[in-house]
Amino acid sequence: PDWPTLTVIQHGRDAHAPEIQAANIDRRHGYLSEDELLELQNACMFHVCPSLSEGWGHYIVEALSVGAVVLTVAAPPMDELVTRERGLLVPYERVGEQRLTSTYYFSAAGLQAAVDRAVAMSDDEWARMSANARQWFQSNRNDFPLRVRSALLESVQ
């Protein structure tokens, strides 16, 4: 589609996926240095994180930390990290299993609709969602030591 450039970072077994030929896809193979990754994370207004499942969602939280508006699957735990106030949720069309976890397969039409909405988003709406993403990250990071302390105290009582 006629969308802005999509930067795709792949490593490991995913790096051998079939090459998609499109002028607006910048596909990066292999691991990036920390500086390269930080530069890309901060340069992109939107981060597309279409995970089938997540343990905690590190790359989603990294996206929120830079104030990116995240597009991710409307399933746990992704939708616990990204809400409508700080991102765009993509519906899933089926659920599978991988060992002891559920996998959520996003709807291609839903992802296209979310990208279309992101592209059409006003500067004010993006700025509000971006600020909400960054604020959530800062609050989560600042409250983490207290939550750990509380959990540890509860576990020894």
Q: What are the functions of these language-model segments?
A:
Residues 1-34, 103:
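Conserved catalytic-core segment of nucleotide-activated headgroup transferases in glycan assembly
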Residues 38, 61-65, 76-80:
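Short alpha-helical segment that forms part of, or immediately flanks, the ligand-binding pocket
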Residues 38-44:
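Short alpha-helical donor nucleotide-sugar binding micro-motif in glycosyltransferases
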Residues 47-48, 71:
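A short hydrophobic beta-strand element within the catalytic core of glycosyltransferases
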Residues 52:
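Aromatic "clamp/platform" in nucleotide-sugar-dependent glycosyltransferases that forms part
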Residues 69-72, 77-82, 88-89:
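Short hydrophobic beta-strand element within catalytic cores of glycosyltransferases
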Residues 94-127:
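C-terminal "capping" alpha-helix adjacent to the active site of nucleotide-linked donor transferases
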Residues 120-153:
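A charged, aromatic-enriched C-terminal amphipathic alpha-helix characteristic of glycosyltransferases
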